């Protein structure tokens, strides 16, 4: 038994000894130097994009730019300006003025951007000169000078940008002219030519008139005579309202009415109750010539009418004028976001916005370089319209002299009415004018302190 225990011990010793020897034979290894690990820079937390600024835009829907087209244009703007959201409010035209007047008068609740088509609102518009000077992509030179001067400028301030253009001109029905064997009018025709042509076209048996009458005194035709209601410095009507030029313009109007070649106010009123206005008479061939605008031009094109366009008739030796208009678009001076409002205004009324409204609506832009891209720009009637737009504007004087419409016009209305209704003899026109000089001067003196000269 003892022998077995001894043998077992010997076996264990033999097996363990080499292991102990092996372990003890290796030298202690030299530790490897630690390799420095790169510093881990924590990833920055993503910065949240700032919330877009919302600006309020008040507008109206029209034949030139529908609500749908304007909302789509605003979306185009937002897509390229993700920092700005436009809240579009489309108001009825009939209520726009009252709502704007109330908001501007209260000094709160007015839109950031809107039409400022009432000159009485101009004091509440933001002066745009600093924004124009800071914008390398914008220049007043983009626009027709006449429309910039009359719809962007207020005194020496820039209070808005002019959107679109419109003008009166004479449209003539080629079918009526051809039937009567009368030559078409040309751009250099005169006021006397107008009466002569209208008389030749008139045919009572067909209930057809040759032409129509001006819409009021001291517009394009009166300016073509060299007539002005009062002095440039707004000091007096003497020598202006009773000048030879003014009396010649009123006398021409009397001759036109007396020719019987135009519908009377009573006839137009009856036709109006039947839903027949001047453009309807023109398209139906009952009016050989009519003083219309670019909207009527598009209506005539859509109706496939055969027509031409010439400026309103002029006077030999005098500068020729046209009666044009544009709409002032402005920023409210109380806006909390003037820079964002400028970015939208300069888009809406700049090349991008006006081209969008032209291509998708019926707007004729106030920017010549954009207007030149109009789809039918090469058509004769469009080229004729463009030539009208290039003329001097009566509005340049009228806009700078607000007291004509602000008082003087009402004071002299009787003479216009008497001529239109055939209630005055030709030779009595000078005396009638002299009788109105006192009331006109009083109206001018009352108005100048109120509206300026």
Locations of regions flagged by a protein language model:
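Short helices/loops that flank or line small-molecule/ion binding pockets
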Residues: 97-109, 176-177, 195-204, 274-286, ...
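Short helix-initiation/N-cap motifs at beta->coil->alpha
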Residues: 90-99, 189-195, 266-280, 325
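Conserved N-terminal structural module of periplasmic/extracytoplasmic solute-binding proteins
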Residues: 8, 20-122, 136-140, 184, ...
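Extracytoplasmic/periplasmic substrate-recognition and gating elements
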Residues: 79-80, 85, 180, 259-262, ...
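Hinge/lid segment of periplasmic solute-binding proteins
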Residues: 115-167, 308-310, 376-380
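Long, aromatic- and glycine/proline-rich binding clefts that accommodate carbohydrate-like moieties
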Residues: 359-411, 418, 446-453
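Glycine-centered hinge/linker elements that transmit conformational signals in sensory
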Residues: 198, 235-271, 301-303, 312
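Periplasmic solute-binding protein
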Residues: 122-129, 148-184, 213-235, 258, ...
């Amino acid at each position: 038994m003892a022998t077995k225990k001894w043998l077992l011990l010997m076996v264990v010793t033999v097996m363990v000894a080499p292991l102990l020897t092996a372990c003890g034979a290796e030298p202690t290894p030299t530790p490897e130097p630690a390799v420095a690990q790169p510093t881990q820079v924590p990833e920055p937390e993503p910065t949240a994009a700032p919330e877009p600024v919302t600006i309020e835009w008040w507008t109206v829907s029209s034949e030139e730019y529908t609500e749908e087209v304007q909302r789509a244009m605003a979306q185009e703007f937002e897509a390229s300006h993700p920092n700005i959201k436009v809240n579009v409010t489309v108001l009825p035209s009939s209520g726009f003025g009252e709502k704007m007047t109330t908001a501007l008068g209260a000094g709160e609740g007015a839109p950031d951007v809107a039409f400022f088509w009432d000159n009485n609102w101009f004091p509440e518009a933001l002066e745009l000169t600093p924004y124009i000077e800071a914008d390398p992509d914008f220049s007043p030179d983009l626009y027709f000078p006449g429309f910039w001067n009359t719809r962007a400028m207020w005194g020496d301030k820039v209070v808005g940008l002019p959107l679109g253009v419109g003008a009166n001109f004479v449209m003539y029905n080629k079918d009526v002219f051809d039937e009567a064997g009368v030559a078409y009018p040309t751009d250099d025709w005169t006021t006397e030519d107008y009466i002569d042509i209208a008389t030749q076209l008139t045919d009572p048996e067909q209930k057809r008139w040759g032409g129509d009458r001006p819409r009021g005194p001291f517009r394009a035709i009166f300016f073509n005579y060299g007539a002005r209601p009062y002095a440039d410095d707004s000091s007096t009507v003497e020598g202006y309202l009773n000048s030879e030029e003014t009396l010649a313009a009123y006398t021409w109007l009397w001759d036109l009415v007396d020719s019987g070649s135009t519908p009377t106010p009573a006839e137009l009123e009856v036709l109006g109750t039947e839903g027949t206005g001047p453009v309807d008479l023109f398209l139906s061939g009952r009016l050989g010539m009519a003083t219309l605008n670019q909207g009527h031009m598009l209506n005539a094109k859509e109706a496939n009418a055969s027509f031409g366009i010439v400026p309103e008739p002029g006077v030999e030796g005098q500068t020729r004028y046209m009666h044009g208009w544009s709409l002032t678009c402005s920023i409210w001076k109380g806006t909390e976001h003037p820079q964002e409002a400028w970015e939208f205004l300069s888009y809406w009324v700049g090349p991008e916005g006006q081209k969008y409204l032209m291509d998708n609506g019926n707007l004729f832009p106030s920017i010549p370089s954009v207007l030149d891209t109009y789809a039918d720009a090469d058509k004769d009637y469009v080229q004729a319209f463009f030539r009208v737009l290039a003329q001097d504007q009566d509005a340049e004087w009228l806009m700078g002299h607000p007291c004509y419409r602000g008082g003087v016009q009402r004071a002299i209305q009787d003479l216009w009415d008497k001529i239109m209704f055939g209630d005055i003899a030709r030779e009595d026109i000078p005396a009638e004018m002299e009788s109105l000089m006192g009331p006109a001067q009083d109206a001018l003196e009352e108005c100048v302190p109120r509206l300026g000269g």
